From Swiss-Prot:
Glycans are attached at residues 7, 15. It comes from Mus musculus. SMART domains: 7TM_GPCR_Srsx. The chain crosses the membrane at residues 31-51, 67-87, 105-124, 145-165, 186-206, 240-260, 271-291. A lipid is attached at residue 308 (S-palmitoyl cysteine). Most abundantly expressed in testes, kidney, and embryonic brain. Other organs also express the transcript, including heart, lung, spleen, thymus, stomach, and adult brain. Several have little or no expression, including liver, small intestine, and skeletal muscle. This is Lysophosphatidic acid receptor 2.
Amino acid sequence: MGQCYYNETIGFFYNNSGKELSLHWRPKDVVVVALGLTVSVLVLLTNLLVIAAIASNRRFHQPIYYLLGNLAAADLFAGMAYLFLMFHTGPRTARLSIKGWFLRQGLLDTSLTASVATLLAIAVERHRSVMAVQLHSRLPRGRVVTLIVGVWAAALGLGLLPAHFWHCLCDLDSCSRMVPLFSRSYLAAWALSSLLVFLLMVAVYTRIFFYVRRRVERMAEHVSCHPRYRETTLSLVKTVVIILGAFVVCWTPGQVVLLLDGLDCKSCNVLAVEKYFLLLAEANSLVNAVVYSCRDAEMRRTFRRLLCCMCLRWSSHKSARYSASAQTGASTRIMLPENGRPLMDSTL
C-alpha cells in the first residue's frame, strides 16, 4: 500500500480522477438541483403518507405491510439523503471535508441499498404467502423484525465500508471517476449485487406467476368462468410487469454506468450521464410508493381518509381564524358619537 492522502482536499481527488469540480453554478448544475429537489420533496410526501396509512389502519398490521412500511421508511431516508446531496453539490462540493464527503455518499448508498434489499424481502414474502395460499401471511412478527433488522444491517455495512475500508485514499490509481474517493472495485461490487437482487426478484416473481397460473387453470377446469380466469391471469401479468419494469427502468441505467466505471472503461463517457441516472434511481423511491402501496384498494381508501382529515383540520383552523378576525372587526365598528348619536361604520 502506498502513501495515504487523508489530509488532502476534495479537489485533489477530483483532479486525480479527471472529474470536473464546479467552482460556480452552471446551467447543468441548476437543472439537476431543481429536478433533484422536486423529486426529493415528492418522495418525502408520498412515503410519509404511506407510513401514516400503515400506522393508522389496523388492517395493515400484517407482516407484508410491515415490509411495505419498511420500504417506505427506506425510501423516505433516500429522499432525505438525496435532499442532503442537493444542498451539498455543485460548487459546494469543493467546500466539503473528506469526512463530510463520505457522509454525503454514505447516506445515499445506505438508503438506496436498504430500499433495494427491502424490495427483495417483499418478493420473498409474497412468494411464501402465495405458496401457503394466504391473503395475509402468518409470518411471526419476530421473524419480520429480524428480516428488517437484517436489511438495515446490510445497508449500513455497505454504506459504511467505503468510508472506513473500501476507499482509494491510499491507492489513487484505483479511484473511481464517478465517485472520486471510492475504489472502482466497490462500485463494481455494488452494481453486481444490485444486478443479483434483480435476477432473484425475476426468479421469485416468475415462479409466483407460473404457480398461480397453474392453480387458476385447474380451478377453471371445474368452473365455466373462463373470462374470470383470463382476468386473473392478466392482472397477475400486469403486476409482475409493473414491478420488474419499474425496477429495470429506474435502476438499470445507473447500474450499467457504475459497472462500466468499476471496470475502468476508459472510452465510456460515464460522467456525462451519471447525475441524471442517479436522479432516475432516486425516482424509484417515488415509484415504489405507487407500485407497492397505491395499487392496494384499502390503501387508497386510507389515503383518502387521511387527506380528507388533513383538509378538514386545515379548513376548521382557517374558519376559526376567520371568525376570530370577524369578531375583532365587529367590535371596532362603533364610531365616536356625533350630535349625541353613535355613528355606525358604513361597511355594515
